[in-house]
């Protein structure tokens, strides 16, 4: 594994929080906070890929790199694949990290941890999860559960992803965190595949990879980062960032 590239997909079309990437958090757009966290991970170059010139301008204003992609991509993974072809047509980067643009408080350490399973050449895609500690999350469909076979105390081989409460019986349940590190060839194969049966049923894109026989391993981390999807989430993110600046 060498020379990872972090790509941050961002689009303005969110229905619950319009213009989400540009939402102000302590004086800077949210996408800039995510970009700064990605830089702090120290993995390699960081590029924002977006369908909005205003997002490109916001990132470039702080010295970051951003590329403009088509507005009609069906998923963030497709946006990543287009951006990768623009940024690195020669194929210098063999690992691509997909960091969502709505995680302004994410710990850079877990971004770096996400690539570690790719040291095993049998792994196609790496991701993150955390043990569920709140009872209400066990049955909440918006909390995606990772069902996996333990490899070490902090690493699982993913067998399934579901919105249901799974697996049955005694033992931990894992909250999947939607940050992915792809081998380049795995990303290129993934976006070439049609949506799968289970992907359409669960509305979980990562099932396409599992159904195609690709291997996904997950690193177990301590906490689930705050994702900003609603005005309430945005207020929480502002409070977290304001508290950090006071310390």
From Swiss-Prot:
Q: Can you say what this protein is called?
A: 3-deoxy-manno-octulosonate cytidylyltransferase
Species source reads Methylobacterium nodulans (strain LMG 21967 / CNCM I-2342 / ORS 2060)
Give the matching SUPFAM superfamilies.
Nucleotide-diphospho-sugar transferases
Q: Does the keyword Transferase apply?
A: yes
Keywords recorded for this protein, A-Z: Cytoplasm, Lipopolysaccharide biosynthesis, Nucleotidyltransferase, Transferase
What biological processes does GO assign it?
A: CMP-keto-3-deoxy-D-manno-octulosonic acid biosynthetic process; lipopolysaccharide biosynthetic process
Q: Which Gene3D superfamilies match?
A: Spore Coat Polysaccharide Biosynthesis Protein SpsA, Chain A (3.90.550.10)
Pathway of this protein? Nucleotide-sugar biosynthesis; CMP-3-deoxy-D-manno-octulosonate biosynthesis; CMP-3-deoxy-D-manno-octulosonate from 3-deoxy-D-manno-octulosonate and CTP: step 1/1; Bacterial outer membrane biogenesis; lipopolysaccharide biosynthesis
Assigned EC number:
2.7.7.38
* Function in brief: Activates KDO (a required 8-carbon sugar) for incorporation into bacterial lipopolysaccharide in Gram-negative bacteria.
An example Pfam family from this entry, by short name, is: CTP_transf_3
GO CC: one term?
A: cytosol
Q: What is its main location?
A: cytoplasm
Q: Tell me the GO molecular function terms.
A: 3-deoxy-manno-octulosonate cytidylyltransferase activity
Q: PANTHER family recorded for this chain?
A: 3-DEOXY-MANNO-OCTULOSONATE CYTIDYLYLTRANSFERASE, 3-DEOXY-MANNO-OCTULOSONATE CYTIDYLYLTRANSFERASE, MITOCHONDRIAL
